[in-house]
A protein has these predicted regions:
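Hydrophobic face of amphipathic alpha-helices that form TPR/SEL1-like repeat modules
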Residues: 1-34
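Short glycine- and Lys/Arg-enriched binding-loop motifs that mark or flank ligand-binding interfaces
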Residues: 13, 21, 96, 118, ...
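A short local loop/turn or secondary-structure capping micro-motif enriched for an aromatic residue
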Residues: 29-30, 47-50, 160
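Conserved strand-loop elements at the edges of beta-sheets that form or border functional pockets
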Residues: 32, 44, 144
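Glycine-rich loop-to-alpha-helix module at the N-terminal edge of alpha/beta enzyme cores
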Residues: 37-127
Length: 170
């Protein structure tokens, strides 16, 4: 079993909008769990690659991304969801190969990723600091604390769903 043709090099890291080799050049084998065969080599990023990613993300947050309105950011997330749906078959095939799950389940995970992006895209300009009332005798308030740049560790068995839940919300 082999991977379909990809529009990027899986042995590269996506940093600051550019696919590039890991700084130390290391890769690791992506193994098909259904039969133990090597599907491809993928980037084995190290701390310097993470540092470059964080620096690029912080620069975007302090620049163009951070200056976008909530409505604009929401539209971008919604567009990501649309793109996922446009490529759902490819993403499902990749997910099935990567984690060894049935294609129907992998497809459902890709659709869930799209739906998370649509949900967070739609809610981006709906958060206004309102506090939901609670029981009498309690003081409740809303404190907005932006996270800034965040890192996400994604488990091997549900990568698309976890990306949707965590990256979409961030």
């Amino acid at each position: 079993m082999s991977l379909p043709d990809l529009p990027f090099n899986p042995a590269h890291c996506l940093i600051n909008g550019t696919w590039r080799a890991p700084l130390d050049g290391q890769t690791l084998a992506l193994i098909d769990p259904s039969n133990g065969s090597e599907l491809t080599q993928i980037a084995r990023g190290q701390s310097r690659d993470i540092d470059a990613s964080v620096e690029a993300a912080q620069s975007a947050l302090n620049g163009e991304w951070g200056s976008k309105t909530a409505l604009e950011r929401g539209r971008i997330l919604t567009r990501i969801g649309q793109l996922v749906l446009e490529h759902v078959d490819l993403l499902a095939e990749l997910e099935a190969h990567d984690v060894g799950k049935p294609l129907t389940q992998a497809r459902a995970d890709a659709i869930a990723l799209a739906r998370y992006m649509e949900f967070y895209g739609g809610s981006a300009d709906k958060i206004h600091g309102e506090t939901i009332p609670y029981l009498g005798g309690y003081t409740v308030y809303t404190l907005r604390e932006p996270h800034g740049v965040t890192g996400h560790i994604v488990p091997w068995n549900y990568p698309m769903q976890i990306i949707g839940r965590s990256v979409g919300a961030a």
